[in-house]
Amino acid sequence: QKDGNTYYIDSWEFDDGVALRYRIPSDGPRCIYGEQTAYTFPSGTHVWYASGPFQYGWIQAYQDRSTDSIKDELLAPPATFLLPNGTYAAITEANLFNFHGAVLFGKENNRVQFGYVENKGHVETEIITGLPDSKFWHEEVRNIPWITSPRNGENEIVTPWRVLMLAEDLNGLVNNQIIAQVSDRPD
């Protein structure tokens, strides 16, 4: 990085998607200010996603939109996409330990970016999203640090895998094995 800090990117390419994660050398707690990992989709890509504060005990209605119209929307992973060429895609994270769970944000030009919110809340956008009348929401965490530490005395902070899965149909997407392949084995 320009500031002299070092970090590493691990990436895996699969026949049906990609996964990447960051490793940050550290011998103790570090402040995390945000993330720039993003995917850009073709105009006209269809997206289905949940958006809202799930911690309040009610089920959030899934949204049915185009990536052309999701700027400033919060997309709870996994978000599912249908590209104009008929390819299905899903974005999520895998192997989450000692790190803040991510959400996705709709950005300009059909870009979907990983980011963080306090308690995975809702970014208010004036779009009806199925929120209850009380409209619980939280502001997006922007340039407000949160603290993470290396896992179990290790000498680096490891982010969850950022996973993009691809398939010809929904069955292929559901049966995608990337998450299992990049995650730690169960105890």
Go through the PLM ranges and name each one.
Residues Q1-P186:
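N-terminal accessory beta-strand-rich subdomains and adjacent acidic, glycine-rich linkers
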